[in-house]
Amino acid sequence: MRRDFAKKLYDAMEKDTRIFLITADLGYGVLDDIRRDFPKRAINIGSSEMLMVGIAVGLAQSGYIPLCYSITPFLLYRPFELIRNYMNYEKANVKLVGSGRDDDYAHDGISHWAGDDMHVMSTLKNIKLYKPRDITDKVFTDFMYNDKPSYINLSR
């Protein structure tokens, strides 16, 4: 599912220069083509998830379409204050992409579990949620181009 998403994201970034990818030291292999071909719009900020979401909020407020990509629990729980305040209340149009669902990364310990992401995110009523079985063109297009802050969860 991640590879399908990355291919669709690559195609979208070719056509739309407003799209930025910000990753927190994740996506090696899957996102390498994007990093290579769009170096000014593909940013790896290291393991600094609050910074990642903060940068994305600034880009969204400047008219860009920022996409944050990381392992689901790190993407959501570390920067939750910014997600709640800026995405949910201020409606900054940031796109969150969580890699891994349920126990996809359980072998790395409880900090990597992602079984409650949809429950937690459902408390933020202004963020559109997606948990697709596969990445169709319709799902991808709706996720990227709806005018609401959004979260999508991708299985490994």
Predicted regions and their residues:
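Thiamine diphosphate
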Residues: 1-156
